[in-house]
Amino acid sequence: MWNLRITPLSFGAACQGIFTSTLLLSALTVPLVCTIVYDSCLYMDINASRALANVYDLPDDFFPKIDDLVRDAKDALEPYWKSDSIKKHVLIATHFVDLIEDFWQTTQGMHEIAESLRAVIPPTTAPVPTGYLIQHEEAEEIPLGDLFKHQEERIVSFQPDYPITARIHAHLKAYAKINEESLDRARRLLWWHYNCLLWGEANVTNYISRLRTWLSTPEKYRGRDAPTIEAITRPIQVAQGGRKTSSGTRKPRGLEPRRRKVKTTVVYGRRRSKSRDRRAPSPQRAGSPLPRSSSSHHRSPSPRK
């Protein structure tokens, strides 16, 4: 992809290299607005917004390598591409797939050119300190067309007669560093969006919350293994698959007046003594007291008389 032939005395080629890098700067630098400001323009749930912000704090080794990440994202997006889906996560993930594929190869080429320039830089040349190189946060505030000018002014302030080949090397290292940091943010956002398509935004939000809790807990107080999104979503999948669907339709509630339940109470008669003679059953209603005989209306003579 990159063919570069430089001789130690090719001053004109070195000057041409600076001019060429100025013209190609707009094509070699990742658009920062795509990786920083885009999520503030989208409407999403407050919990999902916090989880998306927490993605930036996860360890770098948590995310797959760029080649593996792009391949996994394409596999997840392929069904949506076939159906021409316009879902939010599909559109944004597709944008980042294209962005990462294009600028990752470009950034790798910039590193290769910078390494090949080391052979023609005078051995006594001191490298440009990091403080004189434009950082990612500063590049966000500088217009893209003025980025080369600002970097050149810093190199001149470090050493006015800095060698031309060393200047090109410093420019390429600064731009490649900016690209790498922008691509890292794009990589994390791509992981978020295509996993939302695979598992659902709510499940990914829950997973990020549990993972951050596990990472912030001291090692002796937490489990040995980190939580996985498969383990979080498995109970939900089992519960949904185990439900039995009824053939009939469920009657909607609230359309008819509610029937009042009638409570039946059975009142039992007095318990009769075993010593008394059993009387024949009377035609009285069950549970009603037995009528007294006519003799029971007269009082028995008092034993005192």
Curated annotation (Swiss-Prot):
- Site feature Cleavage: at which residues? R272, S273
* Predominant cellular place of this UniProt entry's protein: secreted
Q: Which SUPFAM superfamilies match?
A: Hepatitis B viral capsid (hbcag) (SSF47852)
Where does the signal sequence lie? 1-19
Give the region (Disordered) as residue ranges: 226-305
One Pfam assignment: Hepatitis_core
Record has Secreted as a keyword: yes
What GO cellular-component annotations does this UniProt entry give?
extracellular region
Propeptide position ranges = 273-305
User: Residue ranges under compositional bias (Basic residues)?
Assistant: 258-277, 295-305
Keyword Secreted assigned to the entry: answer is yes
- InterPro entries named in the record: Hepatitis_core, Viral_capsid_core_dom_sf_HBV
In its UniProt record, a GO molecular function of this protein is:
structural molecule activity
Q: Where found?
A: Secreted
Q: Which UniProt keywords apply?
A: Host-virus interaction, Secreted, Signal, Viral immunoevasion
Instruction: Say what the protein does.
Output: May regulate immune response to the intracellular capsid in acting as a T-cell tolerogen, by having an immunoregulatory effect which prevents destruction of infected cells by cytotoxic T-cells.
Assembly behavior:
Homodimerizes.
The family annotation for this protein states: Belongs to the avihepadnavirus precore antigen family.
Q: What is this protein called?
A: External core antigen
Source organism phylogeny: Viruses, Riboviria, Pararnavirae, Artverviricota, Revtraviricetes
